Amino acid sequence: MALKQLSSNKCFGGLQKVFEHDSVELKCKMKFAIYLPPKAETGKCPALYWLSGLTCTEQNFITKSGYHQAASEHGLVVIAPDTSPRGCNIKGEDESWDFGTGAGFYLDATEDPWKTNYRMYSYVTEELPQLINANFPVDPQRMSIFGHSMGGHGALICTLKNPGKYKSVSAFAPICNPVLCPWGKKAFSGYLGTDESKWKAYDATHLVKSYPGSQLDILIDQGKDDQFLSDGQLLPDNFIAACTEKKIPVVFRSQEGYDHSYYFIATFITDHIRHHAKYLNA
């Protein structure tokens, strides 16, 4: 599958690149960002996938989070895809910021008119890793995932639905229980239909209750002054309770004074890179 390089910038000895390709799953052109650390010049490196939140593109993380130095030092290839298909000309895809374009919710839609293109779950877990493994110096056996908000939800569900696929997972202010929050209800009813039993297949709090897999070590940072926390969009307490019941360890850090923004992410990103490096470089 042909990759078209759109940009390449040297950063902390490595290269931050952006590529475009024709996605089979999403049936449109997709962009992704990839950071190749200095170590990638001489051998295969672990791959760490970042999933962004609502309204984001592949650009937000690479320009705002300040992750490059830590990724360079730990020798991690970091991949950041877009958050939805683009330019599919589906009626209503650009009408609201929390549904459609920029709001793929990392699921495979089953409802018309979304089901043909809105297959971000399969894109992130299957198509994109296959593309990365085939074209870049990464070790396919060493892969981890993290994300923010909608992308934190994505990172958690991708891990919980695929035991053993990812070595580690972490999240910043994830949407933990989407079947119960306004964002989730809107997205899931649109993409998955009105049968709420189908929604649980993409809800981290429900997935963790039946998680059969190997031991996970989950790291979550949550700003205490996050407006979406107080609005009931994120519901981390429900997820933590479910993890506690299943004896799955979660390090949940409530960060005084921090909000939902990339300033919050930038503050703690090095901790998250370190968390993943511990498992990826083991």
Curated annotation (Swiss-Prot):
The modification N6-succinyllysine is found at residue 4. One of its GO terms (molecular function) is S-formylglutathione hydrolase activity. It catalyses: S-formylglutathione + H2O = formate + glutathione + H(+). The modification N6-acetyllysine is found at residue 200. GO terms for biological process: formaldehyde catabolic process. GO terms for cellular component: cytoplasmic vesicle; cytosol. The modification N-acetylalanine is found at residue 2. Keywords: Acetylation, Cytoplasm, Cytoplasmic vesicle, Hydrolase, Serine esterase. SUPFAM superfamilies: alpha/beta-Hydrolases. It comes from the Eukaryota. It is found in: Cytoplasm; Cytoplasmic vesicle. The active site is at residues 149, 226, 260. Its EC number is 3.1.2.12. The keyword Acetylation applies. PANTHER family: S-FORMYLGLUTATHIONE HYDROLASE (PTHR10061:SF0). Belongs to the esterase D family. Homodimer. Serine hydrolase involved in the detoxification of formaldehyde. This is S-formylglutathione hydrolase. The gene is ESD.
